[in-house]
Amino acid sequence: GLERQVRLTTNIALNYVAEEKVFILNEPKHLALTWGIPLEAELETTLDNFYTKTRAYWRKWVMRTTIGQFHQEAVIRSALVLKLHQYQDTGAIIAATTTSLPESPGSTRNWDYRYCWIRDTHYTLKALNSLGHFTELQQYAHYIENIAINMGAKERFQPLYSITGDSKLVEKIMDLDGYLGEKPVRVGNQAYEHIQNDVYGQVLVSLLPLFVDLRLVEENRRDLLPMLMNILHQVEATMYEPDAGLWEFRNKAQQHSYTFLFHWAGAHAARKIAEMFRDFEMKELADKLIQQASEQLEKCFDEERGVYTQAIETKNLDASLLQLITMNYLDPNSDRAKKHVEVLEDELKTKEGLFYRYKHADDFGEPETTFLICAFWYVETLACIGRVEEAKEIFERLLTYRNHLGLLSEDVDAKTGSQWGNFPQAYSHVGLVNAAFAISKRLDTQIFL
């Protein structure tokens, strides 16, 4: 049984509730479901007051959102999803509010997403910064900062943590049927044990605004420099180490291009901070790591096809490498960048503008559904290289996959258009926001024109 009592307080006739009868609603009715201490105040007045305050809070929050005219409704909806996925006490943002909704029928790719992935930090903070919600940005950055500050100098970052920062997330299979009978139903996530070395660069990039953005800068940031130096040393220590990568392969370690990209980006962030504080030791190490990461990335370049591959010594392609352009590793105007996009399009894009993460078999076979954030990365990349009309067209096509409430899951079946995976998925909505802002920058449309 439950540790505390669950109680329903309502002014609906109790026999209707107890006997689950259908009845005609001809006046407002109120229901309060409580766990533990029951509602003791007057029902109607209390709930009307709660509703009025709640509506006012969310309307004011939306009014404070920085947003252009490009698909404003969709961006606002995604911003609300992002806000609702944040745990106010610590600032953690979970990947999704559900567990074990399958990525595709019969795939057994059923995961518990009710945790905070460090990897998502860069994308989430970028979206919050664009939306102008600095309180949420600071809360999330401080969550990451608190995890980092409590780690030992040589301790590894995990890919994910609980909303309170707990590290042990043991995966268990529950004796439940699952959504549409799709088993297994998992609680916990084994990925917390994975080696995913891109997280160090992600943390450095994510903490950068706390040092350089004048709207966010706090005094006495110098005391965090030893922590940043420890993280930079972790980049150095893991530079040549194979890992599970962005897609969390369970039985396959490689030297992933995506990891090198964030080693490169994280070292750039550290160099900016070092220059601010005239920390020559940190700057020297950052410069060395930028060079090493670039050299490793170039080992992933397939000269014959003109594309960067998923990892060193593989021909497999990966949609995450669209970000070589959006993160300015490649010059968006260069022939190399444009050819790289074309090859990824040819192999991973569907005719609907959806994108597979990759097409090769993994621990569970070949992927059957497309990954929504990859499609939004593609839109962002198109805007970046100047193919703005195509970016707009595909963005608008992606909006058609939302449900009647404007919500997106993790995956879409390209053949049927059905949504799969945990829902709603913060990653997908972050992708929507960042893609919309990338297009808006290119359009530069004034509201009065």
Where are these regions (language model features)?
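Acidic, mature catalytic/reactive cores of soluble proteins
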Residues: 1-449
